[in-house]
Amino acid sequence: MCSSDLAKAAAKLTYAFANATVPKVNVVIGKAFGSAYVTMNSKSLGADMVYAWPTAEIGMMEADLAAKIMYADADAETINEKAKEYAELQSSPVSAARRGYVDTIIQPADTRKYVIGAFEMLFTKREESPMKKHGTV
């Protein structure tokens, strides 16, 4: 898939999530970085509930890459140390919850219970959107 096809597909997916009026529940279980995370039903795109497992990593980029960019002239030991600090301060599910990107950090064994609860809570969700003839994508 060439880059223009990928960009079109990402735009269509973003458009679909942004205009969906159904309950939107998201569970982050692993790595969720950059614009790919934003496109995949993030809180900023309109997700109603976002849960994260304790092992999730949420942020702009992976900690190792961020440390290599910020400390390009440092030795490997310093880069590893700074990557650990970055991961804790910027990419952890706790920091994502503090910023409002995640509603609750849940244990993997409780995922089913939380997702069912979210859909039960959102069962009566109604979104009033203005009438329009068509979208832009």
PLM features per residue range, with description:
Residues 4-137:
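Ligand-binding clefts of soluble mixed alpha/beta catalytic domains
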